[in-house]
């Protein structure tokens, strides 16, 4: 098996680099050069493609959300029960019964040793 020579690429890259760089300019001058007029067409196409994919993706999510909301309002017995007011009336009656039951079971037991006595002196800390 013959292993590839990775150093053989370096002279090729060097010649390509020297061909693009002008002899009188430095390496940072390439970054400051203005792009040619034909270079801007592909960037605009790329931006339009990204926006198109984003719009398509967003529209798909929005339509699936709307469709799922429509399915929630079907004639499913659970949804019919939730939409009806009977459970709210039953819940209100149950709550009132619980409050009355708790009020009836409440009582206060008075401890005669802890009842306030105006004649007794309580030292302050």
Swiss-Prot record:
GO molecular function list: delayed rectifier potassium channel activity; potassium channel regulator activity; telethonin binding; transmembrane transporter binding
Location (main, coarse): membrane
Topology in membrane: Single-pass type I membrane protein
Post-translational events: Phosphorylation inhibits the potassium current. N-glycosylation at Asn-26 occurs post-translationally, and requires prior cotranslational glycosylation at Asn-5.
BP GO terms, sorted: cellular response to cAMP; epithelial cell maturation; membrane repolarization during ventricular cardiac muscle cell action potential; negative regulation of delayed rectifier potassium channel activity; positive regulation of potassium ion transmembrane transport; potassium ion export across plasma membrane; regulation of heart rate by cardiac conduction; regulation of ventricular cardiac muscle cell membrane repolarization
Membrane-crossing segments per the record: 44-66
Alphabetically ordered keywords of this record: Cell membrane, Glycoprotein, Ion channel, Ion transport, Membrane, Phosphoprotein, Potassium, Potassium channel, Potassium transport, Transmembrane, Transmembrane helix, Transport, Voltage-gated channel
Cytoplasmic topological segments: 67-125
Domain of life: Eukaryota
Annotated compartments: Cell membrane; Apical cell membrane; Membrane raft
Reported function: Ancillary protein that functions as a regulatory subunit of the voltage-gated potassium (Kv) channel complex composed of pore-forming and potassium-conducting alpha subunits and of regulatory beta subunits. KCNE1 beta subunit modulates the gating kinetics and enhances stability of the channel complex. Alters the gating of the delayed rectifier Kv channel containing KCNB1 alpha subunit. Associates with KCNQ1/KVLQT1 alpha subunit to form the slowly activating delayed rectifier cardiac potassium (IKs) channel responsible for ventricular muscle action potential repolarization.
Subunit structure: Interacts with KCNB1. Interacts with KCNC2. Associates with KCNH2/HERG. Interacts with KCNQ1; targets the complex KCNQ1-KCNE1 to the membrane raft.
Family statement drawn from the similarity comment of this UniProt entry: Belongs to the potassium channel KCNE family.
Name of the protein: Potassium voltage-gated channel subfamily E member 1
Species the sequence originates in: Cavia porcellus
Phylogenetic classification of the source organism: Eukaryota, Metazoa, Chordata, Craniata, Vertebrata
Gene name linked to the record: KCNE1
């Amino acid at each position: 098996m013959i292993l590839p020579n990775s150093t053989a690429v370096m002279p090729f890259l060097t010649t390509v680099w020297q061909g693009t760089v002008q002899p009188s300019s430095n390496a940072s001058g390439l970054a400051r050069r203005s792009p040619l007029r034909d270079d801007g067409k592909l960037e605009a196409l790329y931006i339009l493609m990204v926006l198109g994919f984003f719009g398509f993706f967003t529209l798909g999510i929005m339509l699936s959300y709307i469709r799922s909301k429509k399915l929630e309002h079907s004639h499913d017995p659970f949804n019919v029960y939730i939409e009806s007011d009977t459970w709210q009336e039953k819940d209100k009656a149950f709550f009132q019964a619980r409050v009355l039951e708790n009020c009836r079971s409440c009582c206060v037991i008075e401890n005669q040793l802890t009842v306030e006595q105006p004649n007794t002196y309580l030292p302050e800390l």
